Amino acid sequence: MKESSRKQGAASPCAACKLLRRRCAQDCVFSPYFPADEPQKFANVHRVFGASNVNKMLQELPIHQRGDAVSSMVYEANARVRDPVYGCVGAISSLQQQIDVLQAQLALAQAEVVHLRVRQSTNFPGHGLCPDSPSSSGSPSSKQVSPQDNKGMFSHMDIVDEASLGESMWSC
Amino acid sequence: MASSSNSYNSPCAACKFLRRKCMPGCIFAPYFPPEEPHKFANVHKIFGASNVTKLLNELLPHQREDAVNSLAYEAEARVRDPVYGCVGAISYLQRQVHRLQKELDAANADLAHYGLSTSAAGAPGNVVDLVFQPQPLPSQQLPPLNPVYRLSGASPVMNQMPRGTGGSYGTFLPWNNGHDQQGGNM
């Protein structure tokens, strides 16, 4: 079906062959990934990587990996076109700075949590009557539960760790 | 530095690779010294010498060093990982940001809980001087791999990019820190 339609010229060439002004063969490496209705997608990739380089890179990959390779190249090419100086490295640097900020804030928050837990546990022995405290179990006047509190905190933190976040890398 | 581009001195890594004469005005010579042949080899393989020439010519001279270093970084990432290139690193970092944001939200929830708990205790003899120091980030929920948003987020740090040689960009390889798969140095 594809053969007859291509030979008859009914099918339009892919975005790559259209830009390169050449005949779109049946086994064109670009056509599965650069449809005719997305011309800018290939234009940017061609501008940054060069069509022959992309062709070479795709040929060296197994077919089931070419889609992801094209998506990542499109992403990098778009980044390079928008920012000719830093390209993707600008995004990487920004993310690394965000990580630094978040890590600092997390350290502060966790230190404050530990501080509050210690204060709460040390305040209890001074008062014989503390029936209102919801986080206390049993008689607080005879307990030093700091280690258990720490365990509770960390076990709570463990729940937050998600080993399997969404693997959807492409949202173009 | 200017003398390094003279014809009687050794050619730059680019002209050596391309087997051509290194002219005094060679656009590659300031950024691809002959002692770093792999740097140009990677850039040439991924981007092509003519593309890089075009790209550098469109930039102001004071921007070219950063451009070359970022191109070298991306080219090395692409050589190491032909499928994902440096987008793999970006995806890894985005997951890190997401995880840290969740941990910070949980810690802030803990703080709110203890704040209410301490005030609910109503201890008259104690002065409750709680100060909630943590400041959550402004609501920048990062969409995954959106080039437009990603790059707008990148622009504030433009001026803070390190301006060293290619070696200093080794610190930007996230998998050197987070991944155990890679061996490490070039």
UniProtKB/Swiss-Prot annotation, chain A:
Pfam families: LOB
Chain ranges of the LOB domain: 12-113
GO terms classed as biological process: phloem or xylem histogenesis
Classification via InterPro entries: LOB
Top-level division of the source organism's lineage: Eukaryota
Compositionally biased intervals (Low complexity): 131-147
Span list, region Disordered: 125-152
GO molecular function: transcription cis-regulatory region binding
Coiled coil segments of this chain: none
Tissue: Expressed in young shoots, roots, stems, leaves and flowers.
Family recorded in the similarity comment: Belongs to the LOB domain-containing protein family.
Name of the protein this chain belongs to: LOB domain-containing protein 4
Organism whose genome encodes this protein: Arabidopsis thaliana
Gene for this chain: LBD4
From Swiss-Prot, chain B:
Keyword Nucleotide-binding: no
Induction (record text): Positively regulated within the shoot apex by both ASYMMETRIC LEAVES 1 (AS1) and ASYMMETRIC LEAVES 2 (AS2/LBD6) and by KNAT1.
GO molecular function, one term: transcription cis-regulatory region binding
Every LOB domain range: 10-111
Tissue specificity: Expressed in a band of cells at the adaxial base of all lateral organs formed from the shoot apical meristem and at the base of lateral roots.
Taxonomic superkingdom: Eukaryota
GO biological process: organ boundary specification between lateral organs and the meristem
Keywords assigned by UniProt, alphabetized: Developmental protein
Pfam families tied to this protein: LOB (PF03195)
Family under the similarity heading: Belongs to the LOB domain-containing protein family.
Functional description taken from the UniProt entry: Not known; ectopic expression of LOB leads to alterations in the size and shape of leaves and floral organs and causes male and female sterility.
Protein name per its UniProtKB record: Protein LATERAL ORGAN BOUNDARIES
Organism: Arabidopsis thaliana
Gene coding for it: LOB
